[in-house]
């Protein structure tokens, strides 16, 4: 007994001290919680920065103090030490690799306990110079591949590499023919060319934060032996490792580069899966972003040219750093109770978990059991309080989780949770009265009514947690109820008064119903209740409460009367099927009634779509039935989509019509070597239901091509060339990997066929060169496709002509006639088609001023077989030389003999002036001063007049040989616009415009300048002869 009493006294003293200290501080005390922890740091050797700072800051009350460990040993701080503590940060002055490289850990402590931070490494970055030794020259046959070894100097961390050609900064670009490995730094040239001659140097760069350092090697000379460059199959030289390890979330880069002539094309594939959107492929490099375990597997790179192919395979193996799935949290536990804590971490390899208490390793002892990720306490004591950490680690990293354990010893206290003072209860109902004092250890609870001690009976229940439950309540149960609580720390009680009210009853319950999708329904619910209390109604569907404000308009209250709780269901959907419960409740009781609503509609989505028996054009699909939604399923349909389109398309099946009791069908007429997803839809008399989830992606098997390439044609090019063009075959029709084209061609009229294989699906032309090919020679050409599974059908034979030759014959009898001051007509006799070695496209007219060279001539081309042309844009009163040439796709032929023309003088620039008009009955007479041509102008042969009633009507042209004209006007004439201009050999002159308004009398416009047109309208009015003339000079 003496030991127990001493323990209780010690516990009371600790509790009183803790409570008093908290009251004095005004806030709860707690152990250190890290807000900033040290991070891995890379310090560049030779940096101008003279210190390194490792950060550490913890939230704690009282504030934490800090210590630091290096490689597990505590660092000593002092005024003369290179280590300083600034708040919680560790500052290392003049860091040196030999002394300071290592692992650092921050330790934070206050009165509540101690925690340690994650470990952070301090490493030193460096890059030494390349070796000073001269590098051997390299000699290779032109057309063959070559590799230059970088052999970088010692360094940390990894470098980036480029190569110099002859001098800085002439860097070699990565252009498909040349490749620089960022793993080794080596330079690869797939096929050497004459332009590759020169001296090569490896240029290595280190990037550490904002500090960049570069070094370059001695130059190595490349010389080429000139020979006829023969073609050869690819050979992969730059390879990614056989096993590439990566952590989840990282980006993986695989390198693959091959020698070959022609330069090989690189393709990537995953042998045990398909390409994903995370792939970024740029031929020699495959980048996979944000890798996960699904990216693990075997990858293949393929190098291919027209001479063959080479492949290489390697695996990507994905590991993961530790990551918490379940961690400990701050816990308050009663003295004498048991506690189990668990920490669970994921990672690959699987992490090991260890435990720390106040920064020190924790092992099993007495009441404490440590078992991997579990920590168990039996019969907690106050001394178990403190800071605990679980640490999960594998070879890729370490994670820490921290929590504070507070062991409590408290006398019962009702101040936070007293028994409710007034406890209303419904007659014949049930009442629950909690008793929840704060106490540690848990208190023993007794209940009394007045002075009567309550015990369990048919109507009275006291639960293990001290809650009092009274059932079948009557008026006699009213009175005072008191809860008494006691533990070894003390005792307390709390009292409430029970008041009995009338029970709530549902007088009209909802009825079950069946409806179709889209219909409306009202579920009825009426109730009676104690008039001294408010009544409310709530509804639930399958025990989930219905929120009328968030029902998208499908639910609403059907009445505002207090005793009526009817629920209106609007535009019912399948999701509205289920068991509806109406609950009428007051503050003291509630009562419920339920009914079932069945909503019939289209079937639900089928489940579990599985693809099997995959062929080249067929697959077998199976699925499981979905909900029929209370209407039998009549039939199924199957849809699919490919990697080429996101649009779902209905597929043909076997059987054609899939009955509603089926759970499997064959999909036919698929495209070979195509990635597909499938989904299944069910339908009944009410419509087509939602589709199933897509199946997993599959790829149909490969097959030989079944369609010949289209768009076969060609022609053009250089002399002695036959160019054959076609439309590249779409992915839909390639049917397999290794796709390409086989061309067959021969001179028309000969027997033997020449063939050529053109790899790559995107190819679209082939050039055949031979000195024996004459110009515009017809060839018979056929094409078919091939892939790894075989060859497809040949196309129909097309006629393609070799390159054309410029016409050898010139047009003749060329004539040119000046039409106006700036225009001429040219005509000629055509060349004979038989004289052409190509297709005549038309004729080219060249014209140049007398005194200019023919090379400066302007040119106009006609299309087709026309033998005349109208040329505009000439200078007036100018002599021109004109010649004509025939042209085709190869160019223009020889010129015809040139002919000469001289354009006429321009028309008079001055418009007609002193215009007057007289309106008499249905005729308007217009007069003007004659225009006299100047010496540099063409003669005046007459006048043109454009007459229109308004700005929207079509004009009428009148011709006059003299300076007056009579124009008939309609009886309803109100006004008109008239333009007058001179005409002659040089064309039409500048117009004058008159606006005529109907009225008796005359009107006149007098020109005020010889050289300038009137800029504004002039309006002239007289008394009874109201006359208006609106005159403007406009150029048509």
UniProtKB/Swiss-Prot annotation:
Chain positions covered by the region annotation Disordered: 889-915
Locations listed in the record: Cell membrane
SUPFAM superfamilies named among the record's database cross-references: Fibronectin type III, Immunoglobulin
InterPro entries with a match to the protein in the record: Contactin-1_2_Ig1 (IPR047102), FN3_dom (IPR003961), FN3_sf (IPR036116), Ig-like_dom (IPR007110), Ig-like_dom_sf (IPR036179), Ig-like_fold (IPR013783), Ig_I-set (IPR013098), Ig_sub (IPR003599)
Membrane topology: Lipid-anchor; GPI-anchor
Region called Hinge, residue ranges: 599-608
A GO cellular component annotation in the UniProt record: axon
GO MF: cell adhesion molecule binding; cell-cell adhesion mediator activity
Domain Ig-like C2-type positions: 32-123, 128-223, 234-317, 322-406, 412-499, 504-598
Recorded superkingdom: Eukaryota
Residues covered by the Fibronectin type-III domain: 605-703, 708-805, 810-907, 911-1003
Function: Axon-associated cell adhesion molecule (AxCAM) which promotes neurite outgrowth by interaction with the AxCAM L1 (G4) of neuritic membrane. Contributes to the organization of axonal domains at nodes of Ranvier.
Name of the protein in question: Contactin-2
